[in-house]
Amino acid sequence: MEKLIVAEIVVTPIGTTKTGLSDYIAKALDEIKRAGVKYQLHPMGTVFEAADLETAFKITKACHQAVIKAGAKRVLTTLRLDERLDQPRTMEERVKRVMAKVK
């Protein structure tokens, strides 16, 4: 059976000279786009789909390094993984199933 990993990544540059982080986040998002995976940016992070753990880790590393390359002196990266083995469910399917139950 095909599996699908849904990952949420939050890359936070620390000790930058300005309060806005969009320049750094855009660099990380460029790496996710370059990987060619489906993703959704939200106000507090980014969710993406990966075929396997190696791909999820590779994307996470690329995002982390992109923020360092953009000038961050310290970076805090948080990764949450949901690997469902019985039935692959896309990001959209997961949201749709919950919203169908909201009254």
Question: How does the language model describe each region?
Answer:
Residues 1-103:
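Charge-rich, low-complexity N-terminal segments
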